[in-house]
Structures are given as C-alpha cells and as structure tokens.
C-alpha cells in the first residue's frame, strides 16, 4: 500500500442549522485500497461522502489530496480532484446512449460539431476495459441495473477518477451481478484506484475491504484492517454495544400451549408433507438452503399458495385457510421476504400501509373509521420507533430499516396470535436489526407465536427457542437448546452425514 494517502478528511463537520450531521470526522484512504465505510442509518456516511463529492460544503475541517490541501465546494471541484461518487439512485440520462452518458458534460467537438463517432470509439474502449457486455451505442434505458452501474464506473474511468465512492452498490443486484461487480472492483483496486465502499452488509465488507472505518452519530469511531476484522467488534463500534446484546432472547416467560400446529401440509410440489408446531410466546426458526421450500411453506399457512393436503390447527382448533383474508381473520400475520414488491405500497403514506390489514375490520357500515386508523398508525409508529417526520410521509421515501418496521407494524396492528416472518431483518442496518429483534421479543412476551424464516444463521441461533430445518421441500429435523448451532443447522440443511443429522435431533 502506498505510504502517502490519496485522500485525507480531517476534522470534518457539517451543520444544518443548529443540527450537526458530522462532528469532527476523520477519514484516510490510500491508493489501491478498498476502504469500507459502515454505520447505522443516520450515522453520517452519505453526508460525509456528499461533502467529499462537493454536493455539500463542510462547515469546518480540511480535505487533502495527495497530502496537499484541496478546497472542495462544488461537484466540479471534486471532479478536478479525481473524485467520483456513484449514488444509489443512478445519475444517468436513460434516453441517451451509453457513449453520450459517459461523455455527458465533456462532449468531444470540433468546429462546433459534436464528434459522435470518436465518442463511440473512445467509450467502447472504456467499456471493453470493464469487460461489459453492452455497446457504446446502446440506449441506457435498455440496460439492466448492473449494466447501468457499469456505465457509471466507465464514466469515472473516462474522467480519470482516482477515488471512486460507491453507496450501497449491490442493493438492487442479483447474486451473480454482485459477484461480477466485486470482480470489477477488485480489478480497479489492483490498478491503483482508491475505492470507498459504503455498505451495511457484513458479508460484502468481509469479502472486499482492505480496511473498514465506522461512523456513529456523526462521529468517527475507529478503523479496522482486514486482518483485524471481527463481526462482534464491528457491531460494537456501530451501535455501541456488543453482538451478544443484539438478540437478547431472554424472555423470562413460560411457553404456552400450541398456538400453530401444522400437520403434513403440502402443495404437492415445492412443499412435501411437512409438520411443525409453534407455542404461544415462542420464536421458532425455520432454516434451510435457498430453494428448500421455507417461504412456500409459510405461504401455504397464510393462504397465498393452495394446499393439496394436510391440516392446520390454531389454538387447538382445525382451520381451513383459502386466502390471506381468512388467515388475517384468524389472527395470522405474514411478513413477506420481498417488502418492496410483495409487501409495501411505496407510493402510499406510512399510515395507510400500517392500517392496510385492519381497514375492513375497523370500518363502520362500510365506511373508513379515520380516527381509529390514525390511532392505530400513531401507536404503531411509536411502538416500533419508526423514524418518520409524520404518518403521512410516502413509504417509498423511507430507509430500508424503517420500511421493514413499517411492514411489521401492519401485522402488529391486527393484534396477531401468530406471526410468520420471512427474512425479518434482511437488507437493514445493525441498528434496525436490533429494533426488529426487540419487537419480536416483545410480541413473544405477549404470547404471540412467531415462526421466523431466515438465511442468516447467527440470527436463527440467536433468536430461536427451537429450530426446524428444511431440505428439498421437507422438514429434515428439529433442533433444541444447546443443539441449536450453525454446524448442526448446516448438517441438516445439506444432508451431509445423515447419521449425525439423526443424532442431533434426538
């Protein structure tokens, strides 16, 4: 690593009126380094990067490029310093070609005429350098999100950027697209580019970063090198408490009677005859590999999928569930794994999203009870600590963590007996995870039976009283007490060593 930093941000402060979003933050980045920037929502990560990119002007502090003071007051200043920030929302013109986007603001011209052919040739060279599969003449609107991201990177290379800032770049990418992006980022790092990578996804940070810096409440907490990366320490730095406090599943209440009892439930395809039981006040984990049938089993219970066999009991009574409406009437709530496509109404207000499942129940003679709806939404926002300026704010404008809590609040509002939670803390920062786990524990203390589907093994181990593991559409086994370990879960999930699988369930 080069001994001279390409970037130093010293004692950076940024005030909005009397509120300080940044309070004396330091950040040092070297050439040929992937430097991850972590912190909860509101920690100041994006604000710091906007100062670096010239979108905001620092209230105080100093920025050095190659060891020399450099004043950045505008985006043009940042570009002249070799800094490019790729925002979560792509800054591209969809109706223009890839080449036109790469050269936007710096078009080649001669005698007052734009040299489109030369722009296409130069743009294609940059695209080929990235290994991209599209052409410089393609319209941006025809590209995938991952390809549009490559256009942004190509534009940075065309501008000879030396510092590339990426803000949550994998948020809308598939696993394959994410893998390709990582390969590209590491190649740019090896070519000497400094990359600042903003993310709350620890797996990505572990895979990519050479160093990690953490912000909390607008202040610099510290940095860790790749050799010293530790999940527990990162969590402590981000939220101010150890990883063991994140789950806090000590609920100190006796488990009640069986609240949800599923007998040999099947759809004749993805889900083979499967049985499970969840008691009042219990959080039961449902683990397994992707494609094992976990989400499909929850959808059968909630009436989203049609069952071809089996039986469901709620509080000891056999029930027939043909639709989500029937499930809701029985006091069953279902948090879908895809909040944006299958859960939230992004263009509607937060309050409307919260009361979506209670409107029919609380209506008077077919008329909306607005006072009751407002009380429900206000109470839910307070209970779940949803950070919104007011209940009528558009759901699509909220952070991922607040969107997830908003969706959970919809099911809390029905006064549930049973909650089916599919990936309840996926895609949210550590602080939001902690609050979601707190809500789950509170609901369990009130006697709600919770079935939690999760692909995060620490979450399954940390939150579950018992764990069922699915494999190839069937329940492969059940784990209790000290047998709930990541190793035992993976043994059951993969089918490796079936003799051991039987041993850990006995």
Swiss-Prot record:
Membrane topology term reads: Peripheral membrane protein
Residues holding ATP: 39-46
**Where is it predominantly found?**
membrane
Its UniProt entry gives the catalysed reaction(s) as:
D-ribose(out) + ATP + H2O = D-ribose(in) + ADP + phosphate + H(+)
- Tell me which GO cellular component terms the UniProt record holds: plasma membrane
Source species, domain of life: Bacteria
The UniProt family comment states: Belongs to the ABC transporter superfamily. Ribose importer (TC 3.A.1.2.1) family.
What protein am I looking at?
Answer: Ribose import ATP-binding protein RbsA 2
Organism listed in the record: Escherichia coli O157:H7
Q: Which gene encodes it?
A: rbsA2
